[in-house]
C-alpha cells in the first residue's frame, strides 16, 4: 500500500487529470507517484492536508461518514465570531434542508492563529470589515459544507485550510506539520502501521468516536 500526505495548494483539483477548459490545476503537477488517489477531496479553492493512497478500502474507510473520522479545518472568515455563532456551528446548521452533524468550533486568537504561507492569489481584504480565524472539526463532508456552515451563521469564508485528519485510533492526528504548500511526503513507518490496522479491522463497524483534543 502506497500512502502519501500532500499539502494541496489553492487552485488545484483533487484529481490527477485537468478538466477541459478549467482554470484549475491538478495533482499531477505536484505528485509523480503512480496509482495513488485522493481519500477524500478538497475543493479547488480550498487548501491543506490531502491523503493519497493506492488502497481502495482505505479510501472508503476515511471518506464514509459512518466511520466518523474527524477532519479539522482552519477557516478565515469575514467578521468576528461570538459564542452564539460558535455554538450554532457546534450544534449544527441547516444546509439544503438537512441539519449538519454536531461539530467542534473555536475562535483562534493570538498565538493560536495558524502561521500559514500567503495564498496565491491573496485573500480579498476590506478595510471596513475585520477578519478572524476559526478552527472547525467535522465528521462528515458534504459539498462545500464548511463554507455553507460559516455563511449560515453570518461569517463568510475567505480562506479554508484542512489542517488534520483523525484516524480515531488514539494516536496523533495526521497533520500539515513540516509540509509546505505543494509539497508531499510518504507516510512514516508508524503511520503506515496505523493505516494498515485501520483497514485490517474485520469488524467493519462504524465508529462513534470522540471529539479531537
Language-model segments: residues:
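Long, low-complexity, intrinsically disordered segments
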Residues: 209-213
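RNA pseudouridine synthases
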Residues: 1-205
Amino acid at each position: 500500500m502506497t500512502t502519501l500526505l500532500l499539502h494541496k495548494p489553492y487552485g488545484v483539483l483533487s484529481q490527477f487529470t485537468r478538466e477541459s477548459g478549467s482554470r484549475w490545476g491538478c495533482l499531477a503537477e505536484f505528485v509523480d507517484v503512480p496509482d495513488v488517489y485522493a481519500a477524500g477531496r478538497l475543493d479547488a479553492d480550498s487548501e491543506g492536508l490531502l491523503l493519497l493512497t493506492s488502497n481502495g478500502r482505505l479510501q472508503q474507510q476515511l471518506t464514509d461518514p459512518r466511520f466518523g473520522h474527524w477532519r479539522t479545518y482552519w477557516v478565515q472568515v469575514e467578521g468576528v465570531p461570538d459564542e452564539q455563532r460558535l455554538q450554532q456551528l457546534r450544534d449544527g446548521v441547516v444546509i439544503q434542508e438537512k441539519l449538519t452533524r454536531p461539530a467542534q468550533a473555536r475562535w483562534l486568537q493570538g498565538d493560536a492563529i495558524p502561521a500559514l504561507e500567503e495564498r496565491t492569489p491573496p485573500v480579498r481584504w476590506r478595510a471596513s470589515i475585520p477578519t478572524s480565524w476559526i478552527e472547525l472539526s467535522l465528521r462528515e463532508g458534504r459539498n462545500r459544507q464548511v463554507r455553507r456552515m460559516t455563511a449560515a451563521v453570518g461569517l463568510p469564508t475567505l480562506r479554508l485550510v484542512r489542517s488534520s485528519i483523525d484516524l480515531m485510533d488514539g494516536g496523533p492526528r495526521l497533520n500539515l506539520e513540516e509540509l509546505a504548500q505543494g509539497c508531499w511526503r510518504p507516510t512514516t513507518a508508524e503511520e503506515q502501521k496505523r493505516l494498515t490496522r485501520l483497514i485490517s479491522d474485520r469488524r467493519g463497524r462504524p465508529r462513534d468516536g470522540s471529539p479531537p483534543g
